[in-house]
Amino acid sequence: MVVATIKCVVVGDGAVGKTCLLISYTTNKFPSEYVPTVFDNYAVTVMIGDEPYTLGLFDTAGQEDYDRLRPLSYPQTDVFLVCFSVTSPASFENVARSGSRGTSPLPGVLLIVAPVTERGSSVREKLSKQKMSPVRKEDGERMAKDLGAVKYVECSALTQFKLKDVFDEAIVAALEPPAPKKKSHKCLVL
C-alpha cells in the first residue's frame, strides 16, 4: 500500500519558534536549548479517516544568510506554515512585508502560525522599554487575511496549547486547498 505524503514547509525569521514547534509536535517534548537550524526535516504518520498519510515537516533556517538556500525546500510543497513570534514585532513585520510585495514568494496554501509564549506584563514591560508591544491577535488575523492565508492560529510549543490544531489545519488545507480566487475583469468606458 502506498501512503500519500503531505509536504509542509515551515518558514519565518530566526528564533521565532519554528524548530520548537516541530520538535514539540513530533516528540511531545519541548527542546531544552536553542539550536539554529540550517535545514532539517521530520516525518510523522497521521490517520485521516481510515487512511494513513505521511506528514513531511521541513524546517528552514530563518537567518538572512540562508535566504538563497531556503527556496530549495519549496518545490512540491502542499502547505506552508509561516511563523512569527507575538513577542517580536519585527518578525511580524517581516512576514507582512514579504507578502505585501505584490505576490507572495511562497506558492500554495499559507497557514500563519504565531508561537505564543505570553503577552503577560513582563513581556509587555520588556517590549515597552523598546517602545514596542506584543503583536495582537487581531493584527495577526488581519495580516493572514491580507496575505490570503487559509487560517491564522496561535499556539504554544512549550505548553502544547493548540499545537495539534496547527497541524490538523495544515493537513486540511493541504487536502482541501481553497479554490483560487477568480480575477474580476472590469471594463470601464468613459
Swiss-Prot record:
Residues with lipid group (S-geranylgeranyl cysteine): 187
Propeptide: 188-190
Claim: Transmembrane is one of the keywords in the record: no
Motif mapping: Effector region: 34-42
A matching Pfam family: Ras
Heme as UniProt keyword: no
Keywords associated with the record: Cell cycle, Cell division, Cell membrane, GTP-binding, Lipoprotein, Membrane, Methylation, Nucleotide-binding, Prenylation
GO CC entries: plasma membrane
InterPro entries according to UniProt: P-loop_NTPase, Small_GTP-bd, Small_GTPase, Small_GTPase_Rho
GO biological processes: cell division; small GTPase-mediated signal transduction
Binding site for GTP: 12-19, 59-63, 117-120
SMART domains hit by this protein: RAB (SM00175), RAS (SM00173), RHO (SM00174)
Subcellular localization: Cell membrane
Residues with Cysteine methyl ester modification: 187
GO molecular function: GTP binding; GTPase activity
UniProt topology in membrane: Lipid-anchor
Superkingdom as given in the UniProt entry: Eukaryota
Family per record: Belongs to the small GTPase superfamily. Rho family. CDC42 subfamily.
PANTHER family, alphabetized: RHO FAMILY GTPASE (PTHR24072)
Protein name as catalogued: Cell division control protein 42 homolog
Organism from which the protein derives: Colletotrichum gloeosporioides
